[in-house]
């Protein structure tokens, strides 16, 4: 396996730095020969980058300081090698990948060496929290966080409880159950005391969620059910006032669970007190169920709120973690996320320690995979594939970067960023079985690069964009290459070319493609579509949702949402450069999926 490319590999002028990882893992974040921007004529397999189209600000990429991860890195790895490991994880020097958004559990999770909270009190109620103590964390969790923050001062920290103390719950257990209404005040004070104790120890939290995965309750490990109305009430009436009284500036994310239930954060954020609070930052999302497009849907509904992806573990259940990561992280970033956070930062060679290993009826994830593995016998640290997949983003996308527009091709998906210093980073993944020679068009400049099958590359460069790029209407324009959308969601496609398609389409949904060049005119359009629903039609309008109608294509029922066919329609009245609006028409939700369209 190759090592990470040294430094950030940014070269002044038109030179483009390249680091690449291959699917067979013979190269992992390995430096390639730099390429150059030229002024040659654009081809048809283009990724268009336009820093004039700006999206969300990025805060970072990371994982979780679980109890097990901290124990392994602080207590098991030999002290002589710890500095090197932490440099690799938290700085961008040498092989470092610069993790800059880290999550910290408040108490035990399933990835822990024991069950604990910070006021267990032998199971007896302690309403004044007299026995509250973070002594457990002072052994190895706090020291690790302090070292990481010293190495990366820009690091953002998020705190999340899996369960409050058992005496606050209906089950009198840290596993399963609900929060007793009589202990709402005590719960809010518990969270405040945790934040205060950490602050006194030198760690200030940027963000807090009040419950990890509130719709998941299990008897196997710490968890607690909290429906949306309860989270709203606890947040609005107890936690926010407690934070204000304590003069804490830590901001709250709502929800902290999967993409499959966007109604949950919608319920919480609809409340006017929540929306007006300066301490509410937005929504935390997990990636274990549902379409990632839920992030963008909620973002569109609450544009002043942010979106953060705060957990999605790799695991032995994944048959191809390499491909899964590049498709997902790219898609998450293209759907408004300010962060992408894996699960446990470190585990041992048996994917522990975890509660399952205690053999006392507890369970949890014994198949989750880490960023690095620490051998429990030797202390030797090994970088896992997720170190490199995450590193393709975290090393080159700085905190404070903004996502900028980039398009996808039929086989290559991408996401682009502009760093605070003006440098650019483009991550591209070839999701096909063949090598792809692609052209990256930045303004009026281009470079070409051959990307092997199922390989990923991060391209970095500096300079000022010259001109505004246009997209030829006669190229195959991917549905997922929209500049903005309403009423639909991006998803991984099952079509033969790979990549993403547009799905979950409601009547009246639309997507916008800026700066489409129709040249001297077009006469027809082809649309790649699949429908397991009612079908409908797709209208092509110029410059607005109700602008001049260029074409209407029928979207037939194909027998399945991933059963693809290509339909054609005539087109007229379009020439020159326009913003193109595609508008879905139908009678019911679930009209049709669209992979691409192409004018002729």
How should each PLM-predicted stretch be described?
Residues 3, 465-600:
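Extracytoplasmic
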Residues 25-205, 237:
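N-terminal catalytic cores of secreted or lumenal carbohydrate-active enzymes
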Residues 63, 98, 157, 208, ...:
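Conserved, mostly hydrophobic/aromatic
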Residues 186-207, 214-315:
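Active-site neighborhood of glycoside hydrolase catalytic domains
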Residues 306-389, 405-408:
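Aromatic/acidic polysaccharide-binding cleft in carbohydrate-active enzymes
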Residues 344, 373, 377-402, 462-496:
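Catalytic cores of secreted or luminal carbohydrate-active enzymes
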Residues 395, 406-443, 454:
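Carbohydrate-binding surface patches
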Residues 433-461, 536-542:
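Beta-strand-rich binding/interaction modules
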């Amino acid at each position: 396996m190759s090592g990470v490319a040294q430094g950030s590999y940014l070269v002044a002028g038109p030179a483009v730095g390249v680091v690449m990882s291959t699917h067979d893992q013979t190269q992992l974040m390995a430096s390639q020969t730099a390429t150059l921007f030229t002024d040659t004529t654009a081809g048809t397999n283009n990724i268009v980058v336009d820093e004039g189209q700006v999206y969300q600000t990025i805060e970072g990429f990371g994982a979780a300081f679980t109890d097990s991860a901290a124990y392994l890195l602080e207590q098991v790895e030999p002290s002589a090698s710890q500095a090197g490991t932490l440099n690799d994880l938290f700085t961008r020097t040498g092989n470092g990948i610069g993790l800059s958004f880290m999550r910290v559990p408040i108490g035990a999770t399933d990835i822990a060496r024991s069950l604990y909270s910070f006021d267990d009190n032998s199971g007896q109620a302690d309403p004044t929290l007299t026995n509250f103590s973070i002594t457990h964390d002072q052994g190895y969790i706090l020291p690790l966080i302090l070292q990481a923050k010293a190495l990366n001062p820009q690091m953002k920290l998020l705190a999340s409880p899996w369960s409050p103390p058992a005496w606050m719950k209906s089950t009198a257990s840290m596993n399963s159950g609900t929060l007793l209404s009589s202990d709402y005040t005590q719960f809010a004070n518990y969270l405040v005391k945790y934040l205060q104790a950490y602050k006194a120890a030198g760690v200030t939290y940027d963000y807090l969620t009040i419950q990890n995965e509130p719709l998941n309750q299990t008897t196997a490990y710490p968890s607690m059910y909290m429906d949306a109305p309860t989270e709203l009430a606890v947040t609005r009436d107890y936690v926010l006032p407690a934070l204000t009284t304590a003069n804490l500036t830590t901001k709250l994310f709502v929800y902290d669970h999967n993409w499959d239930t966007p109604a949950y954060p919608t319920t919480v954020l609809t409340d006017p007190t929540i929306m007006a609070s300066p301490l509410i930052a937005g929504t935390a999302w997990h990636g274990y169920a549902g379409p990632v497009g839920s992030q963008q849907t909620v973002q569109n509904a609450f544009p002043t709120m942010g979106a953060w992806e705060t957990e999605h573990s790799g695991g032995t259940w994944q048959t191809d973690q390499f491909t899964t990561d590049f498709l997902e992280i790219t898609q998450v970033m293209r759907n408004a996320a300010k962060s992408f956070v894996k699960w446990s930062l470190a585990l041992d060679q048996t994917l522990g320690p975890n509660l399952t290993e205690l053999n006392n009826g507890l369970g949890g994830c014994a198949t989750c995979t880490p960023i690095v593995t620490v051998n429990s016998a030797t202390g030797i640290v090994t970088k896992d594939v997720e170190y490199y997949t995450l590193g393709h983003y975290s090393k080159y996308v700085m905190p404070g970067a903004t996502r900028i527009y980039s398009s996808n091709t039929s086989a290559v998906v991408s996401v682009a960023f502009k760093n605070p210093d003006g440098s650019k980073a483009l991550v591209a993944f070839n999701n096909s079985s063949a090598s792809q020679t692609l052209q990256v068009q930045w303004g009026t400049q281009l470079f070409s690069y051959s990307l092997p099958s199922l390989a990923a590359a991060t391209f970095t460069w500096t300079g000022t964009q010259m001109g505004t790029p246009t997209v030829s209407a006669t190229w195959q324009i991917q549905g997922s290459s929209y500049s903005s959308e309403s009423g639909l969601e991006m998803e991984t496609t099952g079509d033969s070319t790979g990549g993403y398609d547009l799905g979950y389409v409601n009547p009246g949904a639309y997507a916008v493609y800026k700066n489409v060049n129709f040249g001297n005119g077009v006469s027809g359009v082809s649309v790649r579509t699949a429908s397991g629903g009612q079908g409908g039609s797709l209208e092509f309008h110029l410059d607005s949702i109700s602008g001049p109608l260029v074409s209407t294509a029928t979207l037939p029922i194909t027998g399945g949402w991933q059963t693809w066919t290509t339909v054609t329609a005539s087109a007229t009245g379009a020439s020159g450069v326009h913003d193109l609006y595609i508008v879905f028409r139908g009678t019911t939700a679930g009209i049709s999926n669209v992979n691409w369209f192409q004018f002729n």
